[in-house]
């Protein structure tokens, strides 16, 4: 009997140690996203930044960053996909009302796999609730050469009746810096893509749209983050992100009580509760981001290289080019000025000339 008890205890300790030592690494040539499983089986982000040269450095990364720092009884960290109704105090990545009406979800690490895909490596992490047959699969594709990471989530369940999703984020990322500067872009007629930079302070900043098919009319689904200082073109640590979704989107930026920033890209949950049937899989849009220590220029070029290579149809093929007179002349043009533009365009090898707003001029 004593031997059986000791064996069970040893097995439990081994299980805990296995969880505690489990490290999941999503890496490009220059960036590491590192996650750890806690002794109780929860998954936490422990690092996102410059790539480690020595793998032994992972052992120094702690998951329980909030322990004894905020007066909480429980140990908490940057949970990779924080849920509503659990011990996390801030904006969740997913919120669900289960079939029995309960609105609490706890996700535990179940498994992870990595496989080679075109241009990179895909990591799939499976999280499950211990009480409900509710599952979230986190997908990350790291493109090593381009230094770009793509992330999305799959949500499913096998409960007795449909569950209601009222938050469903593509991913959740955390950063720790002395200051955070957000640059977003807003638009209006003849004022497209106007940049605006704001220093983030404690609390939430939300960039979103509820215009449906006109989603990008006043807010662009793209942002830049500068760490310690506003994002610059050729220097400084930055992160650029965009969501692959043409409809209502929402970017949430929340600075917590210890100065950590969480970034949550998602479909806008406004008037968008989703009834998920048993066995059905809800797939979120992809979130694509790039980090750089050399400013926005490098990160932007990396995103463009990635998009041409892997996302845009025939992105590496030659493209027809077009010259629109609007940027050159506005409404102030005539036949002679247009003829000069056409000649210059031909000399440059431009394929087509477009006369814009021609009815307003001579």
Enumerate the language-model features and the residues they cover.
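Aromatic-lined carbohydrate-binding/catalytic grooves of carbohydrate-active enzymes
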Residues: 314-362
């Amino acid at each position: 009997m004593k031997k059986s008890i000791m064996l069970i205890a040893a097995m439990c300790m081994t299980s805990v140690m296995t969880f505690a030592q489990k490290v999941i690494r999503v890496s490009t040539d220059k960036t590491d996203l590192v996650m750890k499983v806690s002794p109780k089986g929860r998954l936490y982000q422990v690092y996102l930044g410059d790539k480690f040269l020595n793998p032994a450095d992972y052992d120094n990364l702690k998951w329980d960053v909030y322990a004894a720092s905020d007066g909480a009884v429980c140990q908490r960290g940057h949970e990779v996909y924080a849920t509503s109704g659990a011990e996390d105090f801030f904006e969740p990545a997913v919120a669900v009302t289960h079939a029995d009406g309960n609105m609490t979800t706890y996700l535990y690490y179940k498994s992870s796999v990595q496989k080679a895909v075109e241009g990179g490596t895909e990591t799939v992490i499976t999280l499950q609730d211990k009480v409900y047959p509710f599952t979230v699969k986190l997908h990350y594709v790291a493109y090593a050469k381009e230094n770009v990471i793509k992330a999305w989530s799959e949500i499913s369940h096998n409960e007795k009746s449909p569950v209601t999703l009222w938050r469903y984020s593509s991913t959740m990322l955390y950063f720790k810096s002395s200051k955070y500067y957000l640059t977003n872009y807003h638009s209006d007629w003849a004022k497209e893509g106007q940049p605006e930079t704001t220093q983030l302070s404690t609390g939430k900043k939300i960039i979103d749209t509820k215009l449906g098919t006109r989603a990008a009319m006043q807010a662009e689904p793209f942002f830049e983050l500068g760490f310690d200082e506003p994002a610059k073109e050729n220097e400084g640590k930055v992160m650029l992100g965009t969501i692959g979704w043409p409809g209502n989107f929402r970017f949430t930026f929340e600075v917590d009580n210890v100065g950590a920033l969480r970034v949550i890209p998602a479909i806008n949950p406004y008037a968008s509760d989703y009834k998920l049937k048993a066995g059905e899989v809800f797939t979120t849009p992809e979130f694509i981001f790039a980090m750089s220590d050399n400013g926005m220029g490098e990160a932007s070029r990396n995103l463009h290289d990635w998009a041409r290579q892997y996302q845009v149809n025939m992105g590496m093929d030659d493209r027809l080019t077009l010259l629109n007179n609007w940027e050159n002349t506005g409404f102030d043009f005539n036949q002679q000025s247009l003829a000069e533009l056409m000649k210059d365009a031909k000399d440059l090898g431009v394929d087509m000339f477009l006369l814009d707003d021609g009815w307003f001029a001579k």
